[in-house]
C-alpha cells in the first residue's frame, strides 16, 4: 500500500465525535482501513417495504452511505467494505429516519465488539477436572458503529427514559456519520 501509514486511523482518532469510540484494541484493525467514501442513496439501495404494489416510486431516495474500504485480506474480518447507510426523511432539513450497517464477518476469535469472559466450571462429583467455561459479553468498540440503534415497532411501548435513550443514540449515530 502507498500513502501515509495509518492515515485513516489517525484521522478518525482526531475526529471529535469519533475519537471517543475508538478503543485501543480497535487500532490494529483500523490500521487496515484504506479509504472512506460517501455515496448518495440510489433507488437500488432502497427496498420500499411500504409500497408492495407495482407502482414505481420516481422520487430519488434521501440519504447517503459511508463506505469503509479495508485491506484484504486482513486478520480481523472477511469484509472488504463495511457500509453504514443513513435513510433520511427530508433533504431541506434532514431528519434521520433510520440507519443500517453491514454485518461484519469476523474471523474466529477476532470479534472486537465482544469480550470473552472465562470462568472455572464446577466439577460434578469430583470425577472430572474443571473445564474453563466461557461467555461473551458486548463491549465498547468503534466497530459497534456498524450496529446502529434499533427502532422498535410502532406497537412497542417505550417509557420516557427508553425513548430519550433511543433519541440520544440516534442523534449521536447521525452526528458521527455526518
Feature map (PLM): residue ranges:
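Mixed-charge, low-complexity intrinsically disordered segments
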Residues: 2-178
Amino acid at each position: 500500500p502507498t500513502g501515509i501509514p495509518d492515515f485513516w486511523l489517525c484521522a478518525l482518532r482526531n475526529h471529535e465525535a469519533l475519537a471517543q469510540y475508538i478503543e485501543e484494541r480497535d487500532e490494529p484493525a483500523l490500521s487496515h482501513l484504506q479509504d472512506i467514501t460517501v455515496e448518495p442513496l440510489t433507488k437500488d439501495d432502497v427496498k420500499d417495504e411500504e409500497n408492495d404494489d407495482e407502482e414505481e416510486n420516481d422520487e430519488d431516495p434521501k440519504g447517503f452511505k459511508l463506505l469503509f474500504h479495508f485491506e484484504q485480506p486482513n486478520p480481523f474480518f472477511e469484509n472488504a467494505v463495511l457500509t453504514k447507510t443513513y435513510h433520511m426523511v427530508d433533504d431541506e432539513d434532514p431528519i434521520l429516519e433510520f440507519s443500517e450497517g453491514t454485518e461484519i464477518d469476523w474471523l474466529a476469535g477476532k470479534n472486537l465488539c465482544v469480550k470473552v469472559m472465562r470462568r472455572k466450571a464446577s466439577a460434578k462429583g469430583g470425577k472430572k477436572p474443571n473445564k474453563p467455561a466461557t461467555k461473551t459479553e458486548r463491549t465498547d468498540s468503534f466497530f459497534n458503529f456498524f450496529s446502529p440503534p434499533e427502532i422498535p415497532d410502532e406497537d412497542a411501548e417505550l417509557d420516557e427514559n427508553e425513548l430519550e435513550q433511543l433519541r440520544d443514540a440516534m442523534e449521536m449515530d447521525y452526528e458521527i456519520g455526518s
